[in-house]
């Protein structure tokens, strides 16, 4: 007698279990990636906030520092993800690839939108800063929510919710305190997530 096809819930459970097992076996857990992003956000946005409070550092220097740190984080994330994906086949690989494409497509789309709004010239430089920081933190939160649902990861889902709250807070506090929110709330959220995932990996918890 043929086996009955799995339900959607059973399929998601299987994908989540396989993903956790692969991460443990291949050393591609999220702790290292989150730590890289925590470093980029804490140092990058922290330096940018400091630069706005002193006249000795040109404003563009903060942008360069953030860009360099983010390129590092993106490169490291790609390396860890590729290493973790070696030898993986089936639903887990497909879901992981689609999730990665979602990040890329969303980032490109949001960049086009923010650039176009900025080009209208109706916003001040302070408001442009709030636009970019708020929308990007919001996008990060939404995609982490999606990842948490896909892999049934409550910590990832909670991190996404925290990022969304931080996005709203960064706009409410205004410029230049929004950079401080990005550093403390955004970077701090990544750091806390990295620590929790690291403890889980060491203890073998799912």
PLM regions with names:
Residues 21, 75-93, 142-149, 194-198:
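C-terminal ends of transmembrane helices
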Residues 35-42, 46, 71-74, 104, ...:
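Hydrophobic alpha-helical transmembrane segments of multipass integral membrane proteins
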Residues 62-70, 130-134, 183-185:
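Alpha-helical transmembrane segments of polytopic membrane proteins
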Residues 105-156:
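Membrane-proximal helix-loop-helix units in multi-pass membrane proteins
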Residues 140-206:
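Terminal transmembrane helical module of multi-pass membrane proteins
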């Amino acid at each position: 007698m043929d086996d009955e096809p799995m339900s959607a819930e059973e399929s998601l459970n299987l994908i989540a279990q396989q993903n956790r097992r692969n991460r443990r076996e291949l050393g591609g857990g999220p702790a290292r990636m989150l730590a890289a992003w925590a470093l980029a956000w804490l140092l990058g946005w922290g330096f940018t906030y400091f630069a706005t409070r002193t006249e000795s550092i040109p404003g563009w220097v903060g942008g360069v520092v953030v860009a360099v740190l983010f390129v590092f984080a993106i490169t490291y994330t790609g390396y860890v993800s590729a290493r973790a994906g070696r030898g993986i086949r089936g639903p887990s690989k497909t879901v992981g690839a689609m999730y990665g494409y979602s990040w890329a497509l969303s980032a490109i789309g949001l960049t086009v939108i923010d650039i176009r709004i900025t080009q209208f010239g109706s916003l001040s430089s302070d408001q442009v800063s709030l636009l970019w920081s708020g929308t990007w933190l919001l996008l990060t939160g939404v995609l982490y929510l999606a990842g948490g649902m896909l892999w049934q990861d409550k910590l990832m889902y909670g991190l996404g919710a925290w990022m969304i709250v931080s996005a709203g807070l960064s706009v409410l506090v205004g410029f230049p305190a929004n950079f401080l929110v990005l550093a403390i709330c955004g970077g701090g959220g990544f750091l806390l997530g990295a620590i929790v995932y690291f403890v889980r990996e060491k203890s073998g918890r799912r």
